[in-house]
């Protein structure tokens, strides 16, 4: 099976220049593909696929425009992957899965340097370093995390990314699939929410990490840093003596705070999933939440986005597949909070402010725990 490993790297100054150059070229090619297809559409011509654009770019456009020689100086695999990503964005738009593709702005877009294993010695990994095509050997900050080539593991592909002044490598490694454990316990249900991040049917409650003093302190620092950056831009517009170098420094401070908060939230999700999977349930049932609809509520949108429900579901699905656990997804219209777990009656007048579920049969339970129990015992579901 293929498994991804992502860790921070410590490139040299020369390697940093190559990474910046490759990422910048990939961003330019992505935007050029969008622009070229827009021009063709305005001229009444047919849409050009990614493969056709790659042939046209290399055989017709670049030979006639020698000033763009720098495109050929970076890895061709990275350029081709940027074209494929742009083509996928158009495909999603044509199938009404997303909006029209937008240009990637410098410094604000998640563009990666893609690499692939073509030869046996292209991608190798040792305990303290990794070999990347066009970069050579790059030191790893976390030693021993990526499986080494010495132990027989093979890196199929990967990507180098940059965020808040830090560099990361993500490697796709071919590893043997773990054996399914036959000693599984009873199934569980998980109710996700805003008051608590997750309530499990076995009684375990995972707190909302965004309500902790640690996150609130960082968010306060972030608001101050953003105000400081905004004032620098205002002074620059007025023609005062704010230097552009100081703006870049302040932008980096804001990016580091964003990155720190995101890492804490992601780490919390990873630990919750790991703890749930270690209980070895036969199945896990979750609800198909309408995240896009919840985001339309301006009073809840920030809280919903901070919980990262979609990332939780994606990672839980991967872990369940890895350990042989069945992941069940219940329809979003299933009234898990309104059903009494004792007598199965539906309480139609239940309000969002009612945190305790009280049924006429005498059953009293926490609202979220009652929902988790109903999800565990749901009979109508889809296997993710």
Predicted regions, residues:
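Gly/serine-rich nucleotide phosphate-binding loop at the start of the catalytic core
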Residues: 1-79
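Positively charged, helix-rich recognition surfaces that bind polyanionic ligands
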Residues: 3, 148-151, 163-384
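Short amphipathic alpha-helical segments
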Residues: 18, 22, 78-82, 268, ...
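A generic secondary-structure signal for well-formed alpha-helical elements
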Residues: 30-37, 41, 90-97, 196, ...
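Stable alpha-helical structural segments in soluble proteins, enriched in small hydrophobic residues
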Residues: 33, 82-93, 369-379, 383
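Surface-exposed helix-capping loop/turn segments at secondary-structure junctions
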Residues: 38-42, 94-100, 282, 320-327
């Amino acid at each position: 099976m293929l498994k991804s490993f992502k860790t921070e790297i410590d490139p040299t100054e020369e390697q940093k220049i190559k990474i910046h150059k490759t990422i910048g070229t990939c961003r330019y090619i992505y935007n050029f593909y969008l622009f070229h297809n827009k021009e063709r559409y305005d001229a009444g011509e047919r849409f050009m696929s990614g493969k056709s654009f790659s042939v046209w770019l290399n055989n017709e456009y670049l030979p006639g425009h020698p000033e763009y020689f720098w495109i050929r100086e970076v890895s061709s695999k990275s350029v081709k992957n940027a074209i494929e990503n742009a083509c996928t964005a158009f495909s999603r738009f044509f199938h009404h899965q997303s909006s029209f593709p937008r240009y990637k702005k410098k410094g604000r877009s998640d563009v990666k340097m893609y690499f692939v294993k073509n030869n046996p010695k292209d991608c190798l990994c040792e305990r303290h370093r990794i070999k990347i095509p066009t970069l050579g050997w790059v030191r790893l900050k976390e030693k021993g995390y990526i499986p080494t080539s010495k132990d027989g593991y093979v890196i199929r592909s990967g990507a180098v990314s940059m965020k808040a002044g830090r560099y990361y490598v993500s490697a796709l490694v071919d590893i043997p699939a773990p054996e399914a454990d036959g000693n599984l316990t009873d199934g569980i249900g998980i109710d996700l929410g805003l008051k608590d991040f997750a309530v499990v049917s076995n009684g375990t409650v995972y707190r909302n990490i965004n309500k902790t003093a640690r996150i609130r302190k960082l968010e306060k620092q972030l608001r101050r840093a953003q105000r400081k950056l905004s004032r620098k831009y205002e002074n620059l517009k007025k023609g005062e003596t704010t230097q552009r170098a100081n703006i870049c420094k302040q932008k980096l401070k804001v990016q580091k705070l964003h990155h720190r908060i995101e890492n804490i939230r992601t780490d919390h999700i990873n630990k919750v999933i790991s703890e749930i999977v270690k209980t070895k349930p036969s199945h896990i049932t979750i609800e198909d939440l309408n995240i896009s609809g919840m985001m339309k509520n301006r009073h809840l949108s920030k809280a919903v986005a901070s919980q990262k429900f979609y990332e939780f579901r994606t990672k839980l699905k991967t872990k369940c597949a890895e350990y042989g656990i069945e992941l069940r997804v219940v329809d979003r219209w299933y009234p898990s909070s309104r059903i009494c777990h004792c007598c199965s009656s539906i309480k139609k007048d239940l309000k969002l402010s009612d945190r305790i579920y009280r049924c006429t049969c005498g059953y009293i339970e926490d609202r979220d725990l009652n929902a988790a129990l109903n999800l565990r015992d749901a009979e109508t579901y889809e296997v993710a």
